[in-house]
Amino acid sequence: MVDVAFVCLGNICRSPMAEAIMRQRLKDRNIHDIKVHSRGTGSWNLGEPPHEGTQKILNKHNIPFDGMISELFEATDDFDYIVAMDQSNVDNIKSINPNLKGQLFKLLEFSNMEESDVPDPYYTNNFEGVYDMVLSSCDNLIDYIVKDANLKEG
């Protein structure tokens, strides 16, 4: 079993959306050896459910997010793969835990997009655009993890 964590600032918009989408894609592809989490680097939303905009877009696409609440990325977290939404998140993760054991990426490294950062829809209100960015990256991320961790698909 490998652990993957998506990380954004508040863990109410981008990273929980990515967690829910990734879980759905893993289910669709019948992959059971990847456990998905999400975390935030800021503590002001701890214990809160995903943002209303994230909930709406996930509901629109019939992707469950039951029981998800905001959690903080901590130095003691031990994830195999850590997937940040933007460069600021990468910097914060490295500051929180300068001795990371897991592999650290930005999500859009697994997309075909020119952008390198997933914009925060908390400020842009573009939840649909973020959904598209996350969805376009998840299968490539899954392919990478399956190969890297020598997992079975199906």
From Swiss-Prot:
Disulfide bonds: none annotated. It is an enzyme of class 3 (hydrolase). CDD domains: LMWPTP (cd16343). Its main location: secreted. This is Low molecular weight protein-tyrosine-phosphatase PtpA. Interacts with host CORO1A. Phosphorylations at Tyr-122 and Tyr-123 are essential for phosphatase activity. InterPro entries: LMW_PTPase, Ptyr_pPase, Ptyr_pPase_sf, Tyr_phospatase_low_mol_wt. The active site is at C8, R14, D120. It comes from Staphylococcus aureus. One of its GO terms (molecular function) is protein tyrosine phosphatase activity. The lineage of its organism: Bacteria, Bacillati, Bacillota, Bacilli, Bacillales. Gene3D superfamilies: 3.40.50.2300. Optimum pH is 6.2. Optimum temperature is about 40 degrees Celsius. GO terms for cellular component: extracellular region. Transmembrane segments: none annotated. It is found in: Secreted. Its EC number is 3.1.3.48.
